[in-house]
Amino acid sequence: VYDGDTPVNERKRIRDRANIILTNPEMLNGTMLPNHSKYGFDFIFSNLKYVVLDEMHTYRGAFGSHMANVFRRLSRITEYYHAVPHFLCSSATIANPVELAEKICGQPFASVTKDGSAASERNYLLIQPPKISGKDQQYYGQESIVSVAAQILPQLMEQRESFLAFAKSRKNVEVVLKETRDRLDAADFLTTVTSDQISGYRGGYTPIERKTIEQQMIRGDLLGLVSTNALELGIDIGSIGVTVLIGYPGTRSSFWQQTGRAGRSKKSCTNYLILDHLPMDQYIGLEPGWLFDESSEHAVIDPDNLLIELAHIRAAAAELPLSLDDIARFPDLGETIPVLMKMQEVRSQNGRFAWAGGEYPAGDFSMRNIDKNKYTLLNQETGKTITEMDESQAFREIHEGAVYIHDGESYRVVKMDLESKMAYAIPFNGNYYTVAGGETNIHVIHSQKEQQWNRIRVQFGDVNVADYVYMYKKLQFHNLSLIHISEPTRPY
């Protein structure tokens, strides 16, 4: 394994000796390609026979678009070293596996679809939260899916069922985790299990935290995890007997991927779907056969997104000088080269375009999204890092006055410094958490094509998206009662 956690001396041994290297997109983008002529990477690229892309269905949207451009850069490097690798991809069920593979890898593909996985009896249960009235009516007339999940999970733990519960947001992961632990700790809840036998698992936890949680799950120290879609992937956490989906995840592909984490042995498994108040969830409640009768959705990427492609053109120029032949890989190269020359980031050299900018353009962007600005949240009392997140999420989650929950523990944000991109929080024992409110404004810059669909006009083109946060709600744990609506010290 060659990733960010691999010790320096181990990295050298892997570069010198390994025949098979397991790595991740960030390591390929930020270390291997920029240093292709150093540290023995030239030997690896010269002898590269196979490139295997696992979990291909996750490479959609901005992430998949970045990955396609990383492979464009990889093809330049392997061509430079006279290597012609074969590409192999594995994917969960999607409607367009061949199309997605060809867009990401830039090579023709053939599809192999025979299912050889273990088959077991699978049970599916839909849960419609009960209707409520009175002061809690603000939650669309039904009990929240978070509260329902916090009632179900202790019962699964009491039955010693190993489970994964999937929430649709990091916030909901933490609220479900805290409310479940609170129920387990309550004096009137008699059980043989304890609150430390359930944990969260999501982005925002450190690699060490995630690895510790994975090992605890494998050993049986934990009975279950509350996770975002981070655990849709094939991370080894032992045998799972039950999944609990806290709301429909949005696509059939995600539904099957999440429920597919249970029953990977030949034992029967149970999958719960708690229906939210949203129209899609309620439609499934009325027509559950829709989940099983229809095919999965298409996975969509846009490798030619100008912001993403430009970031990788800059990185490619620093790896090897660009030429007009590279237009076959980067369609917008002819438009971007004059801009980069004007910015003095590339210079003309013997009919090619060599990098003249900063030392490390591959480190100037995030592969997981377009937003490259990162914010850090610190525990003001200990100085330790609680989490890191991108700017758009930071404005919603760690603005001044926000209550941020990490591994079931609450922190109140007391300061946010936009210049240093740091926020500071203190431990908080209050009975509420916060949810940001705002609006998203979309301005159409250029419409490339449009079509009338019934009474709806559909356009495709370039847009400018602006998110605003101007208020936040204080919601009480366990019943979602609205305590107060506040304004941040400044709008974001």
Where are these regions (language model features)?
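Conserved helix/coil segment N-terminal to the catalytic DExD/H
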Residues: 6-47
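Post-DEXD/H (motif II) to motif III coupling segment of the RecA-like Helicase ATP-binding lobe
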Residues: 57-116
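Extended Lys/Arg-rich polyanion-binding regions
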Residues: 268-271, 277-295, 312-323, 333, ...
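Conserved interdomain linker/interface between the two RecA-like ATPase lobes of SF2 helicase motors
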Residues: 98-103, 108-169
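Conserved ATPase-coupling elements of RecA-like P-loop NTPase cores
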Residues: 31-36, 55-70, 176, 236-238
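A short beta-strand element within the Helicase C-terminal
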Residues: 233-247
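Conserved helicase ATPase core of P-loop NTP-dependent helicases/translocases
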Residues: 10, 205-227
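Conserved SF2 helicase motif VI
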Residues: 250-271
